[in-house]
Amino acid sequence: MTNVVVKLSARDFVHADLASCGWSGSELHLASVATQLERARLGEVDYLAVCSATDIPVAKGGVDYRVKERVGTLWQLAVHPALQSCGIGTFLVEAAELRIMNRGLRRAELGVEENNPRARALYERLGYVAYDRQPDSWHEQAPDGSLRRYETMCTLMRKELL
């Protein structure tokens, strides 16, 4: 097997990125991301794209500053499925943490679904510690286009940023 090194950069996610991010979710999910871009314009959230040299997103995710006071809450984190377990998720989380620190905040939090042990293991490797559990739910689009309510249990995790 040959190893390939790809240079990555993190930047603000822009509306034009939606067309190349079908890998991250359904049309309903992408419509939600579009809504978050307006919140980013207002300074309520940061929404990031991790790109290779082509400037096409291979990962994306947000930091919400309105969930808890003095905390940046990471959410909607996703890495292109073909590129998972290559370090891109780590790059995304670290870029999000930098955004949090640039706002003068020192705590990052996130929720990870309990049926996603690989993601939880990543967050633990990055220094996140579980502190609670909480049910969560959202609408998702089925393959036939219909909407259904998705319900899950999440482990809440946090990290003190240096």
Predicted regions located by residue number:
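C-terminal "cap" of GNAT-fold acetyltransferases
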Residues: 106, 113-117, 126-129, 135-162
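Conserved phosphate-binding and hydrolysis motifs of nucleotide-dependent enzymes
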Residues: 59, 87-89, 127
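Acetyl-CoA-dependent GNAT
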Residues: 3-82, 93-95, 99, 156-162
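Conserved short alpha-helix immediately C-terminal to the canonical SAM/SAH-binding motif I
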Residues: 92, 116-119
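Conserved acyl-CoA
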Residues: 91-107, 129
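Active-site acidic-Proline motif in GNAT/NAT acetyltransferases
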Residues: 80-86, 114-115
